[in-house]
Amino acid sequence: MDPDALFALLNRYFEAIAEPVLAEQGLLDKFIGDALMAEFGVPRHRGDQQEALAAVRAALAMQANLAELNRELEQEGLEPLQQGIGIHFGEVIAGNLGSSHRLEYTVIGSPVNLASRLESLTRQFPQHPILISATVRELLGDHAVVQCLGLCPVKGWPDPIEVFSLQALQS
């Protein structure tokens, strides 16, 4: 694919996945290559369970939007796209980070790293595109249908973590 077509495709993809984040009052932090980093609960926090529910609603809507985009791509003779989503919840440091020449509002901390590691694990579980931590699972309570994938080793963590596949939300 030529560079112009690749950029056009990435922009279509980002449009499809950014909308659900904004609809759930999430923050679009940054686009990194073909990835989107988003947060919920910063700079305003609505409560732990509310933020966890907003994040998983956005993730499920992102999956639905990707399915629609893939139908369009297939009609255009292009290969479908795949995505993996990792969701974790925890205390982070939020603020402007960078140099005097360029500052960006972002979050840092181990919860950010663990969410990224969960996203990476989706490559090992391609049939489970949305992975959540035990912390998120607990916050969701009976609102979510999940499948436990067991304890998984995670780069940078001393012990394996319990990983769940998000299937759906219950009304």
Describe the predicted segments one by one:
Residues 46, 62-65, 69-72, 100, ...:
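Conserved, well-folded catalytic cores of nucleic-acid-processing
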Residues 55, 87-90, 111-118:
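Alpha-helical scaffolding flanking metal-ion-dependent phosphate/phosphodiester catalytic sites
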Residues 49-52, 104-108, 148, 152:
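Allosteric regulatory "coupling" segments in signal-transduction proteins
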Residues 39-50, 85-105, 122-128:
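Catalytic strand-loop-helix junctions within cyclic-nucleotide turnover domains
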Residues 17, 33, 87, 118, ...:
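Residue-level signature of catalytic and energy-coupling elements of molecular machines
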Residues 92, 115, 122-171:
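Cytosolic regulatory/linker segments at or just downstream of nucleotide-handling modules
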